Amino acid sequence: MSGDQYKIQDQNAYYFLTLTVVYWIDVFTRVDYRDVIVDSLNYCIDQKNLELNAWVVMSNHVHLVGRVDGGQGMSAFLRDFKKFTSRRIMELIDEIPESRKGWLKDKLSWEARRSRRAKN
């Protein structure tokens, strides 16, 4: 979901969402990083009223079909989900053996600094 062309109009409506990794980097080929996504989705289902009808984690993006029932709505879910998962994946890159550690951190960190939305 890049740019402002797609705005969440109804915070409690169903949406088909695609969340991509910058530069289409294949981060989710490693199970450890994929588990961050799955665990975060499960947490949001239990704690943030997320209702998922379908989801899939691909090598470099995630598709979700669902809604947030009440609470702060879809925008807040997306903000919190992306913030937590991106930080946790960056931590894991340092913690686990990663052959592309320097390259991954360089690409992902550079984009985070460049983004007008990221507040690090």
What is the predicted role of each segment?
Residues 1-120:
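Short catalytic/metal-binding and nucleic-acid-binding patches
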